[in-house]
């Protein structure tokens, strides 16, 4: 009888260790982020947008990779969008994209090989900032925008600060 108890206790102990081991090994495989953006994660994006953000990744062959993070609060939509593409002539491609900034473009120092910042306001209602830059042969754009023109969380000054932080993060991850 004592022998059966020892065998049963040993079997239960082995089973518990096996299950624990499977949980430790299999757990990280199951616990992955829904968004696989290589340059910025949902937590960082949420901090930049002022609340929990939900990310979406779009990778289509021959097109720029796009990471879009959206944060909704009381009918206000705030979006952080990052696009990255590899260009044969990155300086020319960056210049082409930067034309959308017009005369408003200003150089951003210490971001990638070169970068510009400009307003990205929606004429109808919203407020936004955009960075266009490059790291080696990779051209990137980052836009932070709010659907509310007088957004108390993302004022023009706050947007300028946060777009710079986002640009540091993205350019750093592209190096």
Region spans (language model):
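Short alpha-helical segments used as structural interaction elements across diverse proteins
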Residues: 10-11, 90, 157-159
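A short, solvent-exposed beta-edge/loop patch
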Residues: 106-175
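Short, solvent-exposed recognition patches
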Residues: 48, 53-126
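Bacterial N-terminal signal peptides
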Residues: 15-27
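N-terminal secretory signal peptides that target proteins for export/translocation
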Residues: 1-13
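Generic "edge-of-domain/loop-turn" microfeature
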Residues: 30, 74-76, 89-91, 140, ...
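N-terminal "mature-domain start" segment
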Residues: 31-70, 104, 147-148, 152-175
